Amino acid sequence: RAAMAEFYRLTGRRYGLIESHQMEDAEYAILAIGSTAETAIGSIDHIRAHEGIKVGVVAITSYRPFPAVEIVTALQHVKAFSVLERLDIPLGPDNPLTTDIEASLAKAAMGSPGFPRLTTMPICYSGSAGLGSRDVTAGHMVAVARNMAGATQGKRYFTLGIDHPLALTVEEEPDVRPAGSFSIRGHSVGGYGSVTTNKVIATMIGDIFGFPVQASPKYGSEKKGLPTNTYLTTTKEGKILTHSELQQVEFVPLMDPTTWNMGNPCVGLQEGGAIFQHTDVEEPQRLWDALPIWAKYFMVDHHIRFFGVDTVRIARACCKSDDSLIQRFQGVVLLGVFLRVTPFKAEAGMSDDALFSKVEAPLRKYFGKKGEAVVADNLRAVRMGYEEVFEVPRAIMEATPAAVLAKGKEEWDAKGKDVNAFFI
């Protein structure tokens, strides 16, 4: 505790050995460490409101020394609790954190000095989550709460995120982002510079508009030439607590038009959202006509805005200093598209000149070492993407024959809804 107090004095950030969230009236609790605990914290408002389960979270900050008394104090009035750990040790009685918590409760039940005396022993559930770097999601937290609070006793040991006899079923992925959030799920091909583009967009959102942002890619050299995704969320208020691939998004850029044949990029796109597609055609009607009819149905039905521009043409026109960078310049063009399509500039009341005076700083941060010519090329690519991207008019979309949209609905209903599955 003294060390935590000293840390607060030096940094202004206060941490306890544990951090309790909505435990005052909780009947059930989820205990975890790190990002798993943050995901649980971000999910409990939804669980309380939509599941009617009074659940709280105990985030464990210190594993050694173990905060036994603090944990027992937090759990002394709950009916049951679930411990989530990112490992599975089958040769032990339980996973390590679960074992320590059970031992702490046992010491309290035996009347050990310093512990609160327990009148009843809460039921302990233990789960393995995030194995093999898998995501832990809000949907998992809903399943954990249901497992504890169901009419029949749930699985005392369970897994999350893997196909296993002990796995809990996830029936939905609720949207637990803070109010006012804006999320992007990019679909690209490894080697197109999408990772760098995502980093630059994140930097621009923070530096230009002052919003907190979380960004992550599916990253790895093995992705080169293969379909991949990037993810980004920003919010004007609150804290982004979830750390997983995004389902609910407002903007979906497609850097490769063949993405329409390799999955379902429309999954989770919110009402009134936007899709951008690289295209070598310049007529909105031709871009619309080339879409699969299930995508047309979804866009018309959900009032999606649809944009396009030839990123390859712009990349070739702008990349004068190094021809080997042309492919990656397609991602730079997307920066301009992002600034045009998203609402941030308009909401900030910023002129084009003011905007582009601020764009140069993040570009220089990432490309400045390559020389002034490269920075200038990048800035030109961003501006051309911003100025030349075009929108398919709503009139063209709604002129689609009703019979085509009806057939598109049939295909949409039959189509897979897993954004990560290809060829569905």
Task: Explain the meaning of each model-derived region.
Residues R1-E24, S133-R134, H140-A215, Y219-K224:
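Active-site phosphate/pyrophosphate-binding segments
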